[in-house]
Amino acid sequence: FDGRNTSANNKATDLMALPVRGCCSDPPCRNKHPDLCGGRR
């Protein structure tokens, strides 16, 4: 199960990489999606 979840998460992360970068540089969006931006500062 872990292997499958990792590969699925990696694909989703790759697809979202560009929009997430824009979101993570936008404080309101980053606050709504802390998990996308690493969560930890």
UniProtKB/Swiss-Prot annotation:
Coiled coil: none annotated. It is found in: Secreted. Keywords: Acetylcholine receptor inhibiting toxin, Amidation, Disulfide bond, Neurotoxin, Postsynaptic neurotoxin, Secreted, Toxin. It holds the Pfam family Toxin_8. It comes from the Eukaryota. The modification Cysteine amide is found at C37. Disulfide bonds join C23-C29, C24-C37. Signal peptide: none annotated. Residues 1-20, 39-41 form a propeptide. InterPro entries: Conotoxin_a-typ, Conotoxin_a-typ_CS. The keyword Glycoprotein does not apply. Expressed by the venom duct. One of its GO terms (cellular component) is host cell postsynaptic membrane. PROSITE patterns: ALPHA_CONOTOXIN (PS60014). Residues 25-27 are annotated as: Ser-Xaa-Pro motif, crucial for potent interaction with nAChR. GO terms for molecular function: acetylcholine receptor inhibitor activity; toxin activity. Its main location: secreted. The cysteine framework is I (CC-C-C). Alpha4/7 pattern. Belongs to the conotoxin A superfamily. Negative results: does not affect the following neuronal AChR: alpha-6/alpha-3 beta-4 (CHRNA6/CHRNA3 CHRNB4), rat alpha-7 (CHRNA7), alpha-9 alpha-10 (CHRNA9 CHRNA10), alpha-2 beta-2 (CHRNA2 CHRNB2), alpha-2 beta-4 (CHRNA2 CHRNB4), alpha-3 beta-2 (CHRNA3 CHRNB2), alpha-3 beta-4 (CHRNA3 CHRNB4), alpha-4 beta-2 (CHRNA4 CHRNB2), alpha-4 beta-4 (CHRNA4 CHRNB4), nor the muscle receptor alpha-1 beta-1 delta epsilon (CHRNA1 CHRNB1 CHRNE CHRND). This is Alpha-conotoxin TxIB.
